[in-house]
């Protein structure tokens, strides 16, 4: 399997990667993935906690090896990245409904600073963003959606704090 991503950069610099690990977490990209079943999400987080415990032990023991379950051929990764970067990361895919209460959580928490509040509503001021959907997941009234909203509205919201029993921010 060809080396992709940051591992290729290490190899180009003459550095070796001794180990890599995979921790499966709930995928929060609700354009595709469904997080509406809270029990499934809780089970996924429980498995992740177990994997983290195993990972800590492996790191303590300085184990070497490839512990990742998921890899894709390089050409598939390039095609998916081109689609994602070319169309899916465009902020024009994000919209806000009249349910917006102007709380500003979306703008305050956007890691890309792609959102500004105008007339108490979010406006995406950058053409692209990381499309983390943090704005969508934090909106207390579910007013932010991707595309036509059918998938993201039906697939639920996720913040780790919600499942960790902490205040969601």
What is each of the regions a protein language model found here?
Residues 1-83, 154:
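FMN-binding flavodoxin-like domain, especially the glycine-rich phosphate-binding loop
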Residues 71-104, 108-111:
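A mid-sequence, solvent-exposed acidic-amphipathic segment
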Residues 96, 105-124, 134-151:
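Iron-sulfur cluster-binding cysteine motifs and their immediate structural context
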Residues 34-39, 138-139, 167:
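Short alpha-helix boundary/capping motifs
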């Amino acid at each position: 399997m060809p080396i992709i991503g940051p591992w290729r950069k290490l190899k180009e610099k003459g550095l070796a990667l001794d180990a890599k690990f995979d921790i499966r977490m709930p995928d929060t990209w609700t354009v595709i993935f469904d997080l509406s079943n809270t029990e499934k999400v809780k089970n996924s987080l429980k498995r992740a906690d177990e994997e983290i415990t195993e990972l800590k032990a492996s790191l303590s023991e300085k184990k070497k090896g490839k512990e990742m379950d998921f890899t894709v051929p390089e050409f598939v990764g390039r095609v998916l990245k081109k689609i994602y970067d070319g169309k899916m990361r465009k902020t024009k895919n994000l919209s806000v409904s009249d349910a917006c209460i102007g709380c500003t959580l979306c703008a305050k928490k956007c890691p890309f600073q792609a959102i500004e509040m105008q007339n108490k509503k979010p406006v995406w001021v950058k053409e692209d963003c990381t499309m983390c959907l943090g704005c969508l997941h934090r909106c207390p009234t579910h007013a932010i959606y991707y595309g036509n909203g059918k998938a993201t509205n039906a697939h639920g919201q996720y913040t780790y704090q919600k499942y960790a029993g902490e205040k969601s921010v």
